[in-house]
Amino acid sequence: MSDGLQGSLKLALNEIMTNVFDHSGSAKGCYVCAQAYEKEEIIRLCVADFGVGLFTRLKEKYSNLKNSYEAIKLAVREGITTRSGQEGGYGLSHIRRFIEVNAGKMSILTGDGKAVWNYGGLKTKLRKQTMHLPFSGTIINLEINVDRESVYFLINSEDEIF
């Protein structure tokens, strides 16, 4: 794995972990699992928290939300934040863009909604699923291609990595 890709992966994990501790309300924090698949040249990363979920947290500020799937789609848009009077809302949008540049996959499951982005192949696919057994927290799965030299840099010039 290149140093640049390793840095992008660390940044993505840091953003997800920051979201857990800043927004989830989980008393237990989160669980993180990762595995490298050498033959397929991919890394799979999963972060799960048992907090209030995206729909509950975002509904506090965005009262027009109707369901968990809408909350997921809103959460990955740049500038969407629950903080009042503060800039933010770049974490999940940057992660989604990194996965797009990497031609990887990302899924977010929260409440009764699940969204899956598949950037591999010729077409980008966003798939919606409704879960029969709702999950109160949030689960984020990333599949990263380690054979690519793709590096995603933050677009906002005010963002600092170091």
Go through each PLM region and give its residues.
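Alpha-helix N-cap/helix-initiation sites
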Residues: 2-6, 85-88
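Short beta-strand element(s) in the Bergerat
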Residues: 41-45, 138
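Short, function-defining helix-loop hinge/capping sites that tune catalysis or transport
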Residues: 27, 56-57, 99
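Conserved ATP-binding N-box helix of the HATPase_c
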Residues: 3-38, 93-96
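Acidic ATP/Mg2+-coordinating residue in the GHKL
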Residues: 49
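ATPase catalytic-site recognition across NTP-hydrolyzing enzymes
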Residues: 69-73
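Flexible, glycine-/charge-rich segments associated with ATP-binding catalytic modules
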Residues: 62-66, 77-162
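A short glycine-centered beta->alpha linker in the GHKL/HATPase_c
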Residues: 53-64
